[in-house]
């Protein structure tokens, strides 16, 4: 199945000049969603033995939790500041206009655990770099990173040099 053909491109969203890649068309199609998860699962399995999957709010949850289930692993959510109920570690990262803070529970990753990060889209790599910092602060080892969509023209892989990065659909 051509998953790229199943995606919808929305011009000038969220602002003029941006060509937004809408994943909801894949999520709504049971066969496309299954193909997407199965394809991501193969990429994750190619990294070798690992312990846990991490996904960032919110679309990382969409792919990370079903992958964790399919692979018999746990799932760790990374959330925006103030959304997790227990003690957290945090990292500030830059957005196009300003900064934001991501958090993870202090007991979410055990020292030495092998971690796979899952997200919907690789653009500049900034959010993923923040995820990596959180995992590594707790002593986790990043085994690999899997995205559904990669915007290659934004060169996000450059920020992630030294990490095993895979994607299903490339623009």
Curated annotation (Swiss-Prot):
Pathway: Purine metabolism; AMP biosynthesis via salvage pathway; AMP from adenine: step 1/1. It is an enzyme of class 2 (transferase). Pfam families: Pribosyltran. One of its GO terms (molecular function) is adenine binding. One of its GO terms (biological process) is AMP salvage. It catalyses: AMP + diphosphate = 5-phospho-alpha-D-ribose 1-diphosphate + adenine. InterPro entries: Ade_phspho_trans, PRibTrfase_dom, PRTase-like, UPRTase/APRTase. Its EC number is 2.4.2.7. One of its GO terms (cellular component) is cytoplasm. Keywords: Cytoplasm, Glycosyltransferase, Purine salvage, Transferase. It is found in: Cytoplasm. It comes from the Bacteria. Belongs to the purine/pyrimidine phosphoribosyltransferase family. Catalyzes a salvage reaction resulting in the formation of AMP, that is energically less costly than de novo synthesis. Homodimer. This is Adenine phosphoribosyltransferase. It comes from Acetivibrio thermocellus (strain ATCC 27405 / DSM 1237 / JCM 9322 / NBRC 103400 / NCIMB 10682 / NRRL B-4536 / VPI 7372) (Clostridium thermocellum).
